[in-house]
Amino acid sequence: MIQVLHGLGEHAGRYERFATACNAERIAVVAHNHRGHGHVEEFGHYADHDGWANVIADVLQVRQHIADRFPKVPVVLLGHSMGSYIAQSFVMRHGGNNHALILSASTYAPRGQLRAGHLCAQLLTALTGGQRVNSFLNHSGLGKFNERFKPARTKFDWLSRDEAEVDRYIQDPLCGGDFSNKLWADLTGGLLEITSRDAAATVRQDLPILILGGERDPVGGTIGLTLLADVYRKTGHDDVTLKLYPEGRHEMLNETNRDAVTRDVIEWIQNKMGSA
């Protein structure tokens, strides 16, 4: 079984096509919407207090539900983008409950940048309110990703080379949007947690890890994904697979070569878990 953790500004329903392909190979998929995502009153906001801890607690609650219903089924945790950071935080806290880890469109962010962003978000939360939206924070967090694809057809060209997929994202009322000061404070705080000294060493060393993404993904790309893989390898994890896709952008499961990417993920899981 795969437990999917979606990215920032999207929702679990976007993984239906991936789930259908997995189901055809007898692999079940479970996904939930993170706080502040999907059909919620407070879109773009985790919580007024302890947002990151609550997000991780939600993942654990879903995992416990899976364990209660399917106690003998191994679970692979797949996190995309923001979900990959949540996934890492989860396995650092609850490593024994995971049979494999897949990190899609992730990165190993520079801590200096993270500290600056975290401080800015904390200050804005204190001065103007945690639920308020600040255009500077949102532009700093997401607005620059499209710059390398100029002249761009849309402001979301960085997501995929497939124009139909980009348009589908734009037309989805549950995608995009702006995010609160407190969410940015929580998210950058979570990133500081998972990139802290020896954090990767707290992940169970025998955990199989697949790190995948597009070489042109502005979030991590070749450099960020390679650095992330190196961090885990240097902390004693000897079952780390790095898969980079030439010309690929941020959402490899929605890219022009998505069928091949999906097949790679399924085959990796079957190899690690067994096809039965």
Give, region by region, the residue ranges found by the protein language model.
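Active-site glycine-rich loops that stabilize anionic/oxyanionic intermediates
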Residues: 7-10, 81, 215-216
